[in-house]
Amino acid sequence: YFCGGFVKLVYIVVRPSKVEVVKSALAAINIGGATLFDVRGFGASRGHTSSYRGSQYVTDTNPKGMLMVACKDDDVPNIIQAVRDVANTGSIGDGKIFVNELSDVIRIRTGETGEDAIMEKNND
């Protein structure tokens, strides 16, 4: 089942307020799908103060949105640019993009593998 390393897995971690514009930016460059997660993280911005029922508390993590995209190797530069164009505010906490190699992708319904499994089809 090895697809030859031509498929990448891109993790895009952004502010929750940027998830919808990132989804739109990916659609505009013909990225057919993504898996979305609500996540929490910390980095240079070490948390924030919140209030709950009148009490103030400090949390050491920040809410983030994460999109996971399996794509062709050639799509990665366009994905990175599209995300940076819409998610960059110039402030700490804008997020990160992680790019990994996938050893394979299998479409459960058809058994297609590799790039064939991630290519959007009209009937999928």
Question: Model features per residue range: what roles?
Answer:
Residues 1-124:
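Positively charged, small/polar-rich N-terminal and surface patches that mediate targeting and assembly
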